[in-house]
């Protein structure tokens, strides 16, 4: 979307490229196999709000398309579950609630020492639930991405 920063345009995922599903939380979880124990950093952004869990425990939230960091310390090797819930707000009164006017999405990268081990684009093929966050926003219609 033309108003999103590069991180969102690269990594944002949402269940539809035509329906903004305003006001309705969209949830998923993904199994991430950790090969190296350590302190991980989850970089996140959302349009409009998202919350995150790690192995069922709340670890943070985002309400901005600008990235913020969530530290996940002392992660052990083996499979872990990242849970995600994203809600796209209803647009201002008088604004049509269309994808072009009101896109939604959640974006993340998980890294250890600067090496990315998982991103929200992995949701396409690796969800642990019958979730619907399997679509990346670069396929969106009704808007144009511009670079400066």
What are these regions (language model features)?
Residues 1-50, 54, 74-148:
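Beta-strand-rich recognition domains
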Residues 24, 64-66:
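Short, glycine/acidic-rich beta->alpha junctions
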Residues 58-64:
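Short beta-strand segments within Ig-like beta-sandwich modules, predominantly Fibronectin type-III
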């Amino acid at each position: 979307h033309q108003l999103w920063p590069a991180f969102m345009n690269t990594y944002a995922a949402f269940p539809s490229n035509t329906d903004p599903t305003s006001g309705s939380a969209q949830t998923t979880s993904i199994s991430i196999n950790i090969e190296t124990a350590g302190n991980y950093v989850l970089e996140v952004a959302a349009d409009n709000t998202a919350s995150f869990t790690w192995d069922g425990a709340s670890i943070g939230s985002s309400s901005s398309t600008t990235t913020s960091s969530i530290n996940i310390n002392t992660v052990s090797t083996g499979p872990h579950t990242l849970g995600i819930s994203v809600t796209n707000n209803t647009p201002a009164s008088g604004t049509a609630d269309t994808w072009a006017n009101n896109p939604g999405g959640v974006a993340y990268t998980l890294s250890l020492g600067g090496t990315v081990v998982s991103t929200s684009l992995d949701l396409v093929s690796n969800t642990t639930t019958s979730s619907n966050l399997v679509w990346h926003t670069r396929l969106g219609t009704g808007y144009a991405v511009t670079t400066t």
